[in-house]
A protein has these predicted regions:
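N-terminal Sec/SRP start-transfer signal
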Residues: 1-34, 47-50, 289, 382-426, ...
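Alpha-helical transmembrane segments of multi-pass membrane proteins
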Residues: 13-20, 282, 286-303, 307, ...
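Hydrophobic alpha-helical segments
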Residues: 231-246, 250, 273-395
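Short cytosolic juxtamembrane segments of multi-pass membrane proteins
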Residues: 2-6, 364-385, 752, 841-855
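Short helix-loop junctions at transmembrane helix boundaries
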Residues: 302-345, 363, 713-722, 769-773, ...
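Alpha-helical transmembrane segments
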Residues: 21-25, 31-59, 414-416, 424-453
Length: 855
């Protein structure tokens, strides 16, 4: 036998002759690389987008240092490891105009544009020049026209100051989300106030080591350097990357092995003949690997290119590339991030696994006796069971079932692999369906817990009297404004709650809070006021629409939003997320409550008769001569989240009643929070006009911040949409791979028995009887795979549940029945459809060809 070039010629001939197997393997590899490439690109691109969005809220710096002097700042500016540094001078000063309050931030140019860009004009160069966001100008009653002089009143001394508007900044996400109005100006040259420095290190600079070095150089305390919450953390990306690659490799290798095993078994007789005429085992192994890798190397560029194209299309459809994100004064372009290194590693790992499978398979084939390979015994043992003996058949259908059972156990390896394929496919689809459900919960929770509870928000940054906020007359005008469809309101009355020591609480947290507040303010939110042991809270009056929105957050008890009695109260209690190991209290449904109130308990409050709660005497519990009214309520329900924005961020329980009842207690109370929705039929121009109208109406009341949250809501919706696209894409590609594997496996099972089936057809078996037998076999394997998937899906879904935040927010584990049933029905449907694909050799006119068929 010729050795040079002959192996290459033979393996190419095999690839051309067995086109179906070659095409199946090509599609398997191509879809694998397509799936890997899409997932890796989208994972890295989304990580970039999430990182950019976090930086728009928490600054793009790595850390910040407060309390510096000019010499220390100059030392930082000359540090070669620092990429940039932004400086702010002293504390923000409060200025008022148009009944609104805005903070004046003194700093360098970079401090103004860390999270924004200049939309129009220029940045301030000196103190007295200002750059402001457009929505802030509108709230201050100022038209956004560059070059005009602004008259603002200093909140501290009441003096008017002139400022020149030199620039208009893009919206800063955090400011708009919480209603914080800021103006940026230059630093005062004569000021001796301390400086705040935001620092960004150069790439590859080790963070912890550099922080320790700066602490020593600047001679500051260990805790003086604070890490920015949005500092890029690649570790989470790499962990998620490894998890995704692992899952994809497992699924794709299972499918590949199924297809390749059939391909190998089909060619074994030819391999046996080659061995018989002198081919060595090593040559056989080389030829097998050449076949595999020729398909593999053609599939790599095809699958990768298709993956890049699919990822680009998804990002284009999702609108990510059109996002306007400004950082460090420039628009941060969202571009396709192709992780070539990760893709290359995946290709190498896949190539190694493919080669290992091919090497092991070729070695096994080479070790078999040549005569067995030629006769296609494949080293296997024919397995028969007495229970499937045809002699025991009582009817024609009984004989069909027994024949099907006999064929099932004759080739246990193929049967087991078919069952495994069905199991993996059903489990994967069920897991993806469950992940889709968790994403829907996450979307809703994120929207509500981020206070994106209305298209327009009118809130306060701070209040300490019940008559501060939107007057009720003005609130009525706002609610009746053309274009407004829904209104939710909250009015608050500062109260003191009689502290019942019998009520359990998080003693450790409240003790730390008490010490911290005493150190900073000299008083705390809890203490003895001369008559009672109390803690400060608020009695919030919600309108009927806002009360309805509380229903999903009920932890215990119940209430009627339309008929909440005057002696009933709803208590909003924060909890500690035990799964996260403590941390800060949050609006969790599960976990340890900050105070252990229950539905049916009584709670007593008291409030000042004159409602003068904006004095220092009230805050430090020294107003012993004031008159108070006592009220006792019965807790109707305990909720985990107050829904309406609490700008005071109260960690003690909030008390909620109906707005109509609160008005009877305090007729002069105002509205501190309003959420409004516009008419769905409004155009973009009409929505902008409505925003302007609401800003004008809101500015008629002191300290009210009015803004549109439509962009923020759409951002949250887009995040959900993208994730659903990924899940759908994974499901479709995986479905194609599983169907391809099942088709090849079941077709192989039919081809290997062509001779026997043709003999049965010759003695009277009809095509319908053969199809019945195949239906029994395929559906039996499918049913076993489905049952196995049902058993294994429970721990997998429970892991997904525990790994998410669903439990913390009150979403208990529920098996994904709908997704499982759809996957099971789909698997059985594939088994049924493939049962009707009878080979041509089994047809009546080709029975003779089938009897002499060489497999």
């Amino acid at each position: 036998m010729r050795k040079c070039g002959e192996d290459f010629w033979l393996h190419s001939r095999f690839l051309r002759k067995y086109k179906k197997n070659t095409i199946a393997l090509f599609f398997c590899f191509s879809l694998t690389f397509l799936l890997m490439t899409v997932l890796l690109i989208l994972l890295h691109t989304n990580f970039l987008i999430s990182d950019l969005q976090a930086k728009t809220e928490f600054t793009p710096s790595d850390c910040y240092i407060d309390g510096l002097d000019n010499a220390q700042v100059e030392n930082l500016r000359t540090d070669p490891d620092i990429s940039w540094i932004a400086i702010e001078q002293g504390e923000g000063r409060i200025y008022t105009r148009n009944n609104q309050q805005a903070y004046l931030i003194r700093g360098d140019e970079l401090s103004a544009t860390m999270m924004a860009g200049v939309v129009e004009g220029r940045l301030p160069e000196n103190y007295g020049e200002v750059a402001v966001e457009r929505w802030v100008l509108l709230n201050l009653g100022i038209e956004p026209v560059i070059g005009q002089t602004l008259l603002l009143t200093d909140f501290e001394n009441g003096k008017e100051e002139e400022f020149i508007l030199t620039g208009i900044l893009s919206d800063i996400y955090a400011n708009k989300r919480y209603g914080l109005m800021q103006m940026h100006t230059g630093m005062e040259a004569s000021s001796t106030e301390s400086l705040l420095a935001y620092i960004k290190f150069k790439d590859q600079v080790p963070y912890n080591e550099k922080v320790a070095e700066l602490q020593a150089e600047l001679e500051i305390k260990n805790d003086s350097i604070k890490e920015c919450p949005a500092r890029t953390n690649y570790r989470s990306l790499y962990v998620l990357e490894a998890e995704i690659i692992g899952v994809v490799l497992i699924v794709c290798m299972v499918v590949f092995y199924g297809i390749y095993r059939i391909m190998l078994l089909t060619r074994l007789p030819q391999y046996g003949m080659l061995r018989a005429i002198g081919m060595k085992r090593k040559q056989l192994t080389q030829m097998v690997l050449l076949e595999l890798y020729e398909i593999f190397f053609i599939s790599v560029p095809v699958g990768t290119a298709l993956g890049i194209g699919a990822a680009w299309l998804i990002l284009r459809i999702s609108g990510d590339m059109d996002q306007h994100i400004f950082l460090s004064g420039e628009r941060a372009e969202v571009q396709l991030t192709i992780p070539w290194l990760a893709i290359g590693v995946c290709i190498l790992i896949t190539g190694g696994l493919v080669g290992s499978i091919g090497l092991v398979s070729a070695s096994r084939a080479g070790k078999q006796r040549i005569i067995e390979i030629v006769r296609q015994k494949n080293g296997g043992k024919k397995r028969t069971k007495n229970s499937f003996s045809i002699d025991n058949a009582q009817s024609k259908n009984g004989m069909i079932l027994r024949m099907g059972g006999k064929y099932l156990v004759c080739d246990l390896k193929t049967m087991c692999f078919t069952v495994l394929t069905v199991c993996v496919g059903v489990m994967l689809f069920t897991g993806l369906a469950y992940k889709a459900r968790t994403l829907e919960y996450y979307r809703n929770d994120t929207r509500e817990l981020s206070y994106l509870n209305g298209q327009y928000a009118m809130t306060m940054l701070h209040y300490n009297r019940t008559d501060q906020g939107i007057s009720r007359e003005n609130a009525e005008i706002i609610a009746q404004t053309s274009g407004v469809s829904q209104v939710r309101t909250s009015s608050s009355l500062p109260v003191r709650v009689i502290d019942n020591k019998a009520v359990g609480r998080n003693e450790e947290y409240y003790d730390e809070l008490y010490e911290r507040q005493m150190e900073i303010y000299g008083y705390s939110d809890a203490g003895y006021d001369g008559k009672d042991q109390v803690y400060k809270s608020f009695l919030n009056g919600y309108n009927e629409e806002a009360l309805r929105c509380l229903k999903p957050y009920i932890v215990e008890g119940d209430f009627d939003p339309e008929n909440l009695k005057d002696n009933q109260i709803i208590v909003s209690v924060l909890r500690m997320d035990q799964r996260a190991g403590g941390g800060l209290p949050g609006p969790y449904k599960e976990g340890s409550p900050m105070m252990d109130y229950h539905a049916g308990d009584e709670i007593q409050i008291k409030y000042r008769n004159d409602f003068r709660t904006d004095t220092e005497e009230y805050e430090n519990f020294s107003d012993t001569d004031a008159e108070y009214t006592y009220k006792t309520y019965k807790i109707a329900a305990v909720v985990s989240f107050p829904f309406m924005y609490d700008c005071r961020h109260t960690v003690y329980p909030l008390l909620i009643t109906s707005d109509s009842y609160l008005k009877t207690i305090s007729p002069g109370s105002a509205i501190q929070c309003m959420y409004l929705d516009g008419d769905p039929a409004l155009s973009e121009q009409e929505r902008n006009e409505l925003e302007g109208t609401l800003i004008r109406l809101g500015s008629e009341n002191a300290s009210i911040s009015t803004r549109s949250l439509i962009d923020e809501i759409e951002r949250n919706e887009m995040f959900y949409f993208k994730r659903m696209v990924y899940i759908t894409g994974i499901a479709l590609v995986s479905l194609l791979l599983v169907i391809m594997n099942m088709t090849n496996t079941l077709r192989y099972r039919m081809q290997t028995r062509t001779k026997e089936i043709s003999m049965l057809r010759a003695v009277g078996y009809t095509r319908r009887m053969i199809i019945k037998m195949l239906l029994f076999e395929n559906c039996a394997m499918g049913a076993v795979g489905i049952m196995l998937a049902f058993i294994l899906s429970w721990p997998v879904l429970k892991y997904l549940h525990s790994d998410s935040e669903m439990l913390a927010f009150g979403h208990s584990f529920v098996f994904e029945s709908a997704g499982f049933l759809i996957a099971a029905a789909g698997a059985l449907l594939v088994c049924i459809v493939l049962s009707f694909r009878v080979p041509a050799e089994w047809k009546t006119r080709r029975i003779a060809d089938g009897i002499v068929h060489v497999e």
